[in-house]
Amino acid sequence: MNNRRKIVVIGASNVGSAVANKIADFQLATEVVLIDLNEDKAWGEAKDSSHATSCIYSTNIKFHLGDYEDCKDANIIVITAGPSIRPGETPDRLKLAGTNAKIMSSVMGEIVKRTKEAMIIMITNPLDVATYVVSTQFDYPRNLILGTGTMLETYRFRRILADKYQVDPKNINGYVLGEHGNAAFVAWSTTGCAGFPIDDLDEYFHRTEKLSHEAVEQELVQVAYDVINKKGFTNTGIAMAACRFIKSVLYDEHTILPCSAVLEGEYGIKDVALSIPRMVCADGIMRSFEVHLTDDELEKMHKAAQSVRSALDGAGIK
């Protein structure tokens, strides 16, 4: 029986190395390949991770430096390559659009020479622009391309609410949708805990102060840049988000998760990639869910689409 599971991670900097190590932590692969223009960095990260496999608690995963030839027989390819926002910079991922779109074109040009069967998980920012480019420019099966999208914002949102109500964040339901970035929005109409809708939680959890939706939304957008400015980068949360998708694919879980892909008429939107709930399984994205949104939430979804389309137009991407 062949239980081989090969994952290629393109980009070995802060995010790529974190993804590789979380893959090992959760025993999601038998082989992890790191590819980077800086081969010394990729070699060092792979070697460091391989040393950890000697620990009694670790799985004997093969870590190594690779190249695009490794994509031929990969099950999953995770793309993290490209510059990101640095401490002190203007907090707008969309300003990276032109630069990273060119990088994605180069990376995908190499991948499609070797495979059109691997699941591709996008992390590179601006995430929705990168996902759109990869999905529309290379005749790669769209169901096999997803961006981590607002999965990370959803994790952050659930943590914020959990802290306010003193409950396990895994008991919080609800999505952050739209753009992975400044135009992300909380779909409050999907939010609740333990079977109670969001509007009942203050009373049920005995909060003395009414929850401010606006304050939560502001914190949700700002916290990523606070982490960047204080830590220098974000990598742990996004690595966990990527591994959630990897697990759903490898175990054919049919999990419904918010992720980025090209919209094909959902909410009356086309020709942009945005995050909405989608079912993810061994065949990639199996279906999308046009969950009911309030008029205000629907307006925010369309504003997110306009934001991403503006970035695409600015980069000359149709």
From Swiss-Prot:
One of its GO terms (biological process) is lactate metabolic process. It comes from the Bacteria. Substrate binds at R93, N125, R156, T234. Its main location: cytoplasm. One of its GO terms (molecular function) is L-lactate dehydrogenase activity. GO terms for cellular component: cytoplasm. It catalyses: (S)-lactate + NAD(+) = pyruvate + NADH + H(+). It is found in: Cytoplasm. The keyword Membrane does not apply. InterPro entries: L-lactate/malate_DH, L-lactate_DH, Lactate/malate_DH_C, Lactate/malate_DH_N, Lactate_DH/Glyco_Ohase_4_C, NAD(P)-bd_dom_sf. PANTHER family: L-2-HYDROXYCARBOXYLATE DEHYDROGENASE (NAD(P)(+)), L-LACTATE DEHYDROGENASE. Homotetramer. This is L-lactate dehydrogenase. It comes from Selenomonas ruminantium. The gene is ldh.
